[in-house]
């Protein structure tokens, strides 16, 4: 079912499915991004830097969050206008992540009255419910009718 601006209210929470981050995911992101930093490719180096082993790229975790979120809702339009994140804790192979978003603002667009602007606070958490990534999204959402 498609969700429109009129269906969304401040305080509404949206939780995604869960997904395990694998070593293969990290390896694929190394190849895709070209980011071969040893924190992502070498367990020994990552341990010497104070981590439990190699860690996922922050942008990999953000990309996975985006994919999980896109499957959690069917918003009309749903185009990102702004996105900001803070990388809080490392994600290691075998960690299971999911995201919880809370709508903090809903308003009709002034320039496009057939659309609205929705602001969300987003937290991506691991299997221990520790926040690993958090921030804000601003998205454009279709409305059912004119203002």
Question: Can you annotate each of these PLM segments?
Answer:
Residues 65, 87, 101-103:
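Conserved hydrophobic positions within beta-strands
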Residues 38-40, 79-80, 85-87, 117, ...:
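Short, intrinsically disordered/low-complexity patches at protein termini
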Residues 74-95, 99:
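Mid-chain, well-packed structural core segment of small domains
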Residues 2-10, 91-95, 100-147:
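HotDog/MaoC-like acyl-thioester-processing domains
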Residues 1-82, 144-147:
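Hot-dog-fold acyl-thioester-processing enzymes
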């Amino acid at each position: 079912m498609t969700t429109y601006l009129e269906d969304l209210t401040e305080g509404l929470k949206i939780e995604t499915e869960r997904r395990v981050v694998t070593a293969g995911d990290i390896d694929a992101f190394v190849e895709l991004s070209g980011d071969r930093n040893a924190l992502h490719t070498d367990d020994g180096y990552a341990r010497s830097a104070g981590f439990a082993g190699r860690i996922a790229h922050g942008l990999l975790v953000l990309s996975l969050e985006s994919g999980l979120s896109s499957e959690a809702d069917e918003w009309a339009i749903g185009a990102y206008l702004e996105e900001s994140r803070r990388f809080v804790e490392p994600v290691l192979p075998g960690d299971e992540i999911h995201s919880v978003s809370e709508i903090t603002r809903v308003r009709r667009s002034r320039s496009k009255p057939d659309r609205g602007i929705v602001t969300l606070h987003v937290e991506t958490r691991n299997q221990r419910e520790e926040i690993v990534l958090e921030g804000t999204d601003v998205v454009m959402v279709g409305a059912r009718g004119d203002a």
